[in-house]
Amino acid sequence: MRVIKVGGSVVPMLDKILDTSSLHGNSIIVHGGSRYVDEMARKLGVKVERLVSPSGVMFRRTTRRVLDVYVAALMRANRELVSFLRERGIDAIGVSGLDGVVLAKRKKLVKAVVNGKVIAIRDDYSGVIKSINVTLLKNYLKVGIPVIASIAYDPEENVPLNVDGDKVAYHVAIAMKAKELRFLSDTAFLIDGNVVERIPLEDFDEYLRYAGGGMKKKLMMARKALESGVKKVVIEGLNGRTVIS
């Protein structure tokens, strides 16, 4: 089993980074859609605010209006990705948390650092992933390759939620007992402009301090995946790949 996370920024250029000939019935694709969210928000005049968590990871503040844009944008990305795969003879099946694949609980508060102070945000529609519907995914795998949009569903509040695509990929990999987790991004991990081709797990912390933003988040998910049974994690960009094992 292999789980492939496709970053929203690379969906339009998948033919340059994804070897579709290697896809088989034991693969699951998860995708994000930040590029699509930003583009749709601009067209609709919806302000998207980006904040930084106390751990240093940037995130999008998800108001109810932003949530509506988020869901619509990710479903558009999902359609494009599924169409790309089907045009190449792959039986791709578009799904999301709204189909019951990814269940989450809405966060009661979100912490962010503003002007050097930690503040609490209580009107956010982001979630903590609670479970992956393994039975449903196994049924999808019988007929094709599931392509999961990173939208979760909160059954208690009956609302969709914004969840991080890298975290969705991690949870799917663990739930499905995947041997490999692959992140497709616009860039591999760089230090001083050079691609880091391999990160031994025993030296992980040394490399982590050079990472920032989305790459730091990917590396953190990579370590959790390896510690939870995944054998290999690959961060693959247009400029090369970083293997973590």
Curated annotation (Swiss-Prot):
Superkingdom to which the source organism belongs: Archaea
Gene symbol of the encoding locus: lysZ
Chain positions recorded as substrate binding sites: R60, N162
Catalytic activity entry: [amino-group carrier protein]-C-terminal-N-(1,4-dicarboxybutan-1-yl)-L-glutamine + ATP = [amino-group carrier protein]-C-terminal-N-(1-carboxy-5-phosphooxy-5-oxopentan-1-yl)-L-glutamine + ADP; [amino-group carrier protein]-C-terminal-gamma-(L-glutamyl)-L-glutamate + ATP = [amino-group carrier protein]-C-terminal-gamma-(5-phospho-L-glutamyl)-L-glutamate + ADP
Entry EC number(s): 2.7.2.17, 2.7.2.19
Subcellular location: Cytoplasm
Site, as annotated: Transition state stabilizer: K5, K218
Free-text function comment from the UniProt entry: Involved in both the arginine and lysine biosynthetic pathways. Phosphorylates the LysW-bound precursors glutamate (for arginine biosynthesis), respectively alpha-aminoadipate (for lysine biosynthesis).
Gene source species: Pyrococcus abyssi (strain GE5 / Orsay)
Name of the protein: Putative [LysW]-aminoadipate/[LysW]-glutamate kinase
